Amino acid sequence: MSIHIVPKEQLSKDRINEKTADYIPPLLFANLRNLYQRRAERLQQLAKESSFVDYLNFSAQVAEAQQKALHDNPLKMEIADILEKSVIEGKPPLDCKTFQRTEHWQKLLHSLIAELLPDASEHVNAALDNLEKASEQELEQMADALLKNEFSQVSPEKALFIWAALSLYWAQMANQIPGKARAEYGEHRQFCPVCNSMPVSSVVQIGTTNGLRYLHCSLCESEWHVVRVKCSNCEQTRDLNYWSLDSEHAAVKAESCGDCGSYLKILYQEKDPKVEAVADDLASLILDAKMEEEGFARSSINPFLFPNE
């Protein structure tokens, strides 16, 4: 199954199966009012019991800066035409590899830099200073490379801040989509149906979506439904295994696939209601190391930790 976003009117005319549309929402948009603040608080909480205390607290500062930049730089745009075109082409409406960005994302970047500079360490200060002095063209080139998954083209210390701004931009746009989502047969379920980016992790939720697994987008912060006990990367079900560091009842596990050799973290809200897709993924880096030792490759990206090769 794949997920496509269509205008509300078209969804009504198509008379999509009510059980799929109503009881298993294919797509959930982020609540930007408290997303980044909640992430910052979770990072700070996890830092208290982590050997990565300094980096988790630093990441919390970035998340807090994102919350402020979001508040100070609202975005209003007409997205109905973009959605209609994406329906015709059968592509994600905000495809990160082809979408024509405006200067708004750079405005968000400079807002983040201004917020973070006063308390930045010497190493972070150097990265922020370099970004602040970079030309618009240089920033666009680095953004292009990151959105095309060409991570080796951008140093990790710069990539973090550029992605933080791009993520804010895409999240703002995603929240203005006036359509609904429908699930239908197709491919590429491993990528976000809104922006075509990779997930960061997946969350088995509680509440109105109790027991359902949603992949969380590393860019636009949207979440899309993928059934459990199926590889989110290749959709095979034959050779799945679940790994954890503590016990079989751990709130954070890794789902590995013997068919494609990949793995993705799964967070269980029923085990810990406070788990957060980005924060808990970042705080469980030891589990990533274990999965690499076992020969599995990560099928996701964390916005606070970019590969340098």
From Swiss-Prot:
Signal peptide: none
Cell location: Cytoplasm
NCBIfam families registered for this protein in UniProt: FdhE, PRK03564.1
Biological role: Necessary for formate dehydrogenase activity.
Protein origin, superkingdom: Bacteria
An MF annotation (GO) of this entry: ferric iron binding
UniProt record similarity statement: Belongs to the FdhE family.
Keywords recorded for this protein, A-Z: Cytoplasm
Keyword Cytoplasm attached: yes
Keyword Transmembrane: no
Primary localization: cytoplasm
BP terms from Gene Ontology: protein maturation
Gene Ontology cellular-component annotations: cytosol
Family annotation (SUPFAM superfamilies): FdhE-like
Protein name, entry field: Protein FdhE homolog
InterPro entries: FdhE-like_sf, FdhE_C, FdhE_central, FdhE_N, Formate_DH_accessory
PANTHER family noted in UniProt: PROTEIN FDHE
